[in-house]
Amino acid sequence: ITKDISNLQPVCKYIPESLQIAGNQGPELKQLSAKFQSLYKQLPWHPSDRSTDKKSAFYRGHANAVMTGHGGLEEHSSVRFGVSLIAPNIEYPNHKHPPEEGYLVISEGDWRQANGDWFHRKPGDTVHNVPNIWHAMRSGKSPLLAVWMLWIE
């Protein structure tokens, strides 16, 4: 599958930088980065449905893509597996959802759960969100790229 990169969300210009950061972190992330480099242009990137103001920094500064599950490259009924990209200095606002969620951090960023403090995660770290917990994430001076999985069942 080949996708015309002109259809990518503008924030996708940060993917090479994110993958370079991850590729410098060790053999596992280097291999994952190389595989993702060959895949990301095929993915259906779109802003979150939580963002409707097309002029907002959040709308222009983030994108999600589903790889497996509803709306992804491969349909699956019990899991959604995808990736989120956040441009530098953008916050993905507080939200919650019924499915349990896990993240694998590809390029660093901060997470917050419930009313807790922000906590930093580096490439290769993980984050776990229990069902219906309020959570948010934000990037710093570098873009944040993270793979996520939602258990639908």
Name what the model sees in each region.
Residues I86, P93-P123:
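A short beta-strand-loop-beta hairpin characteristic of the jelly-roll/cupin
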Residues V66-T68, S84, Y103, R138, ...:
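Residues in well-ordered beta-strands of folded domains
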Residues I86-P88, A114-G116, H120-W134, R138-K141:
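Conserved metal-binding segment of the jelly-roll/cupin
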Residues E101-L104, K141-E153:
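A short hydrophobic beta-strand segment most commonly corresponding to one strand
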Residues A63-H70, V79-H97, P131-N132:
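Conserved short histidine dyad/triad with adjacent acidic residue
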Residues I1-S77:
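A short, N-terminal "cap"/entry segment at the start of jelly-roll beta-barrel domains
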Residues H76-S77, L104, H120, V130:
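Short solvent-exposed loop/turn micro-motifs enriched in small/polar/acidic residues
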